[in-house]
Amino acid sequence: MDSGNIGFVLLCAAFVFVMTPGLAMFYGGLVRKKNVVNTMMTSIFIIGVGIVMWVLFGYSLSFAPSGNAFIGDFRWLGLEGVSLTEGYTDDASIPNMVFSAFQMMFAVITPALITGAVAGRMKFKSIFVFTIFWSLIVYYPLAHMVWGQGGLLGADGIGALDFAGGDVVHISSGVSALVLCILLGKRHDYEHSIYRIHNIPTVVLGASLLMFGWFGFNAGSALAADGLAAHAFMTTGVSAAAAMLSWMFCDIIKNKKPTLIGASTGMVAGLVGITPGAGFVPMWAAVIIGLTTSPVCYIMISYGKKKFGFDDALDAFSCHGTGGIWGGLLTGVFSCTAINSSAGNGLVYGEFAQFGAQAAGIGITIVIAVVGTLICYGITRLLTGKIRVDLRDELMGLDVSQHGESAYPSFNGLDN
């Protein structure tokens, strides 16, 4: 075991933890003020649920070497038997417990991403139950299939590359968000009102915390304080910067002015796009990934939602699902064995196999997310009854109806 690597990965785990409150602020700033508390709560509560589930059975189901390609076994329930001195794999330089702590933070933020799609119209108790079953049915199996020993999609399977969560985190949550918002239906005034962002500074602060945590998210996935971690750190920043610029350019073309919300959203889109390939693609490719991910997400947000008629309230699918798919495919275009020996060369180097593996992995991830979300929705409806809030509660705002709180109370206890 290497003490430097242990300290580095634990620090990165703390960075990733910050992403969840950062997401709460990012989402909370985007909604109307009557839904701020509820929107932030639907991210924050998952810190509690996600960590407890991970310790009790999540890590075991995700990473225990079960011998099958789909899910782990129960040998590490309650983290019993998870070593403090031996690695998850024979060549690991960090203890199994440290690896578990790092992955735990991924399991927390992933279901939180989904909640943005249904902001302002889903009962809190239903989100609570849905999150539990989604983690069980979608996230843990996918984590095992992509990153676990003998997993269907990873190095022991079809060979799809996912350095830090393109499939496991972004595509799974983004596609699930799309399915859930379609099942739940549109907000009552979706096509008749102009939704105004209530607090732009909060959005910027949230996006900044997300990017701060994302450096640990991607660099930490090298699982060592080495050159690969440095490379992933740099590709992360480069892609985010390029994506911010290209989103601003899209804003200028469409609206004649750059916007602060656009710059913040573009930065997040670039972070999503580079996640699957951060430790596999050259630095120049990170620029291309960032520059192209923003326009793809921008088109989905500006035109795709209207064209296909779904109400993805805070663009969880349009940003994370679309950006994750695009980034995953471009990983198959630009991946380079010289950067990471575990990767195959991509299309630009004249080889097709890696791109094919990426496409197959993305396709399987989408199927799992769609089917799993349908199952989770059915279970949630069975256990909680009606999932959507009543029209009166939706009009009044979920802060009061679901939590009895207001983010901005006036002297008489009501929103000003």
Model-predicted segments: where are they?
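Glycine- and aromatic-enriched membrane alpha-helices
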Residues: 1-416
